[in-house]
Amino acid sequence: MYRPDHASHTATTAHHDDRVQFLVVADESSLPELEAELALLPLCARGRVFVEVEHPEDVVPLSTPMRMTVTWLSRARRSGRPGTGDRCARGEAATRAVRAWTAEMLCEGPGETRAIVLGGFALVSEVQEHLVAEVGMAPTAVTAAS
């Protein structure tokens, strides 16, 4: 997938990494489904897992492939719209994290990215819309369930 904002990220040597990277996004309402999806990933899978929860105490151990990085996002420790004092709305922390991750990690190249999005309707619809409409991922590369 071509990203004009990443056009300057080329190197003089070829990068032959054609493995699939995974982006997995979930919230506390879908932890059982998240555990099942992570168990189905190949042992050599690589990528990022974002899990949004209400409080830091809601963090639980997850079994993931060795090359997957898990980031827990606590809404209680994040603000809503900057400068308003509003709390972080459900799905907002994960959506922000996905936007930042895609801006940094999705570059033109031989590799493929697949996304698995689980959770509440707002989270799933916003992340799916971002990945397909804004980033340009194929709809078939995004598995979404709310």
State the predicted function of each range.
Residues 1-146:
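Extended, composition-driven regions rather than compact fold-specific motifs
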